[in-house]
Amino acid sequence: MSDMAMIRIGILIAGLLLVAAIFLFGRPKKSPQGRRVDKDDTQPRERREPVISSGVDADGMPFERSDTGAEQSELELDDQDGAGGNDVGKRPNQDFDKIVSLFVAAKAGQVLRGEDVVVAAEKTGLVFGHMNVFHRLVEGHPERGPIFSMASILKPGSFDMANIREMQTPAIAFFLTLPAPMTALDAWEKMLPTVQRMAELLDGVVLDDSRNALGRQRVAHIRDELRAYDRQHQAPPLTKSPRW
């Protein structure tokens, strides 16, 4: 199997990791009997996250993922969150209706080294925090939650700083969860240059949510989508009392 094929297989897991991550942002812990993951997944949303059946393990080899495996991944992230106790980048609530994602993938025959990813993240203004992943925060208002976040595509998606020198990943995922602490278009305009700069620093390539090279046409399409999203979610105009 070619290196690019392995990267594409690896990125498939990111969609599930993103959904699991969103459920964990600001999510109160529940007993296993109280979980309603299947019911939540059936609720209509503007964006349908990909349903996947395979991914890659820490060695870059394919592994099968079942519904039970997805729940286990969620539990692993939950445990890490409790152990770390870092709420930097935690969403104030779990409500969301759209996710916009991009990827930075290593070039053929290469990998992204954990240590290099951390250095690049710090250079681009990302902060390590909630769920042991990186976040871009609103300057001066971290309590508003992340503008966007960055995770590894390898399960469980987090960065183990104690073993960061040994970490390798074929790609990293950036995800913008809406509503964000600013307009969707403004949030995108902060995420896109960060992703592009990360790709430069890591000598990687930027991929869209379909795992294709991100081009101008796709960027323009995403901007149009987010403008429409902002129009739909803007506050209704205040009615003015008539002048007499």
From Swiss-Prot:
Gene3D superfamilies, per database record: ZipA, C-terminal FtsZ-binding domain
Record bears the keyword Phosphoprotein: no
SMART domains to which the protein is assigned, alphabetical: ZipA_C
Subcellular location field: Cell inner membrane
Pfam family, any one: ZipA_C
Periplasmic side of membrane: 1-4
Membrane topology per record: Single-pass type I membrane protein
Family, as annotated: Belongs to the ZipA family.
Function recorded in the entry: Essential cell division protein that stabilizes the FtsZ protofilaments by cross-linking them and that serves as a cytoplasmic membrane anchor for the Z ring. Also required for the recruitment to the septal ring of downstream cell division proteins.
Record-linked HAMAP family: ZipA
Protein name as annotated: Cell division protein ZipA
Organism whose genome encodes this protein: Xanthomonas campestris pv. campestris (strain ATCC 33913 / DSM 3586 / NCPPB 528 / LMG 568 / P 25)
Gene name of this polypeptide: zipA
